[in-house]
Amino acid sequence: MRSKALPPARAQGHIVPFLEAAALFAALCIFARTAALMLAAAITAPLPMAETLFWLGRQSAQEQPASSVQVEAAPDSTPEAAASSLPQAVQALTGNIEDYLVPLLGEEARPADAGTVIEKNYPQGSGEKYIPCGAGSIKNNTRQTAADIAAEIENPLPFSIEPNSPDPQVLVMHTHATEDYRLSAGLWFAPGDGARSTDCSMNMCAVGRVVADTLNAAGINTLHDETLNDYPSYTGSYANSRAVVQQYLARYPSIKVVLDVHRDAIETESGSRYAPVCTVDGRQAAQVMIICGCDNGTTVQLPGWRQNLRFAAAWERSMEGMYPGFTRPVLFSYRFYNQDLTTGSLLIEIGGHGNNLNEALYAGQLAAKGLAAALLGGA
């Protein structure tokens, strides 16, 4: 059907409103587009900054010196009951030790030629060679008088730790990283078990990891080095570890404490192995022993031995006060052990080759809690 043309006057009356509506629609579109662009700018403007911060975070996390720095991430923890005199950061520590423990061998795995393990708790010493140190003690194998040592350990720490600092405060490392523990649940060891291993999930590195994690959880920025300084050759291991520590100190001058974490080796003439043990909160742990060197004026040059001794005493006092029976007496002797590098350099023996790995892992956690208390002012 053919449409009729509208009269001119009527057609003009429809066209004008249509053009006005079109103009209004166009204006609204322009306004909407401008508003959308402004909103997008507001949303996306922070993204370059966020991307930069993310990249910097990744770069910081990936930074490592050539000696394989590993900054241990702290495990999840929840508040636990603790002595009110301890720093809040230590009171809040639980750090589920179950997260670290390994399956141990049962009796069905015991070989016919298995060796014997003898458990023993080493008490604190008494007599002229021993200086009381809180609930603990110091065994004096030097010519320093007991009165001199007793007076020295009453002095404050020669350094202060910065809690929650972005800069490393503590270095955990291992001169004899390949030292390991027995893997049996019973009091026996297979030939070769509890001697040496390059497996860092089984040797001293595993214990050091627990120590570092616990300190980090307490707000003490801690690095953990897993260099196998005694592999492939045991000879020269202290020269190797000295170079490693010097590299860390040059890169991170904020480090105040260097812990060389080892295990002991105590056995009978017949080859049976002693396991230094104690019980803490219903769980068996390896006992620990701090070794602090002294300058003898000739072959052992440790001009800062007094500062290290103060640190050893504070740590011993803290650990034995928190966990009675956990420590053996501090060994104060003419030993070098690279303890000239800082005023907070110590060696700690965590158990011995007669202990199983789980006892040592638990001891590492307890030792670190005691250290955190000492460093944060709760000793």
List the model feature ranges, each with a label.
Residues 20-256, 265-270, 365, 373-379:
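N-terminal catalytic or cofactor-binding beta/alpha core of small enzyme domains
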Residues 325-379:
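Active-site-adjacent mobile loop/cap segments within catalytic or ligand-binding domains
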